[in-house]
Amino acid sequence: MGFKCGIVGLPNVGKSTLFNALTETAAAATANYPFCTIEPNVGEVPVPDTRLDALAKIAKSAETIPTRLLFVDIAGLVRGASKGEGLGNQFLAVIREVDAIAYVLRCFEDDDINHVEGRVDPIADAETIETELMLADLDSLEKRIPTLDRRVRGQDKEAKKTLELVERSLVLLREGKPARMAQVSDEERASFKALNLLTAKPVLYVCNVDEDSAAAGNAHSARVAERAEAEGAGCVIISAKIEAELAELSPDERKAYLAELGLPEPGLNRLIREGYKLLGLITYFTAGPKEARAWTVTEGTRAPQAAGVIHTDFEKGFIRAETIPYDDYVALGGESGARDAGKLRLEGKDYVVKDGDVLHFRFAN
């Protein structure tokens, strides 16, 4: 699994159209009225990576298995969702479990598609979404205080630390600032994450533009990109309409259509790349006659923990990792050539896995 991304947005911004296109399914009932996504839709998509195909060809692998990305499509939020208006409130618990939140913002003009606020303003839309998520976080934290207070009076040291984090986060939220702006030390990071705050999650702005703006964006998406840069958030320009059309085509037709539009790749690729960047994820590979497979870990993951992604026994019995950088593996024609050229390294438990490493783990049964 690459990462789990919750998709949120106001009604009629193209959110479910995008979800359907990305997952190549019509599971969401797209229609021009609010709340057409009645239940959270969950879709898995393979992460496209040309490196995997190259490895499979060299290793003569019978099968290629990409890592996967999980999208959770949440019903359209409206102003007041955190107070139970619309259908937004019941879905907040669902998006607490995701790694990042994609704000789908309407960056196109179309008189035939109504905007719930009666205007096209992606910055205002982003602020509406953020406000509802902040209000939900406020409610969640305020409800924790009585229990934490009782535990603190009982000399519970962990509760005292948690209460300090809660109070610090509440100060920010009451000032209209998201929890991700909180100053958190390395020791506090795990406890802060356990608060499961919506506004502490990384944000990826998805600018849904018209077809003519898919390559370079437009004035609306430019404003969003400026905001994203100021916040350190991710930003990607996508035309949900184009993505929906691409989803219906064969690989060859898709390639021709992209060339005709002047687009180097589908929007999904850009979305995944931004997500990886935002979450600090990397991919390593395993390759052999049976299969070539991609695995996703966070930057800074050491070899035993990377092995544990395959199976917990690999981590428990880890001895060492046979390691070949991707470029060397390809240039030297695979494991045998890399070994002969002295490019295969034996790495121990302190080795930090790098993006593109081709690994074979040795472990004790």
Which residue stretches match the model-derived regions?
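Glycine-rich, flexible loop/turn motifs
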Residues: 26-34, 41-43, 51-54, 83, ...
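Conserved nucleotide-binding/hydrolysis micro-motifs of P-loop NTPases
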Residues: 25, 51-52, 75-78, 106-112, ...
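Switch/coupling subdomain of P-loop NTPase systems
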Residues: 89, 96, 100-103, 108-136, ...
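Short, glycine/charged-enriched secondary-structure capping and boundary segments
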Residues: 22, 84-87, 116-119, 218-221, ...
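C-terminal-of-GTPase-core extension/linker across diverse P-loop GTPases
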Residues: 2-8, 13, 19, 147-354, ...
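Conserved G1/Walker A P-loop phosphate-binding module
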Residues: 1-112, 123, 142-143, 148
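Amphipathic alpha-helical transducer elements in NTP-driven molecular machines
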Residues: 35, 49-52, 65-71, 85-98, ...
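Flexible beta-alpha connector loops of hexameric P-loop NTPases
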Residues: 77-84, 118-133, 152-158, 212, ...
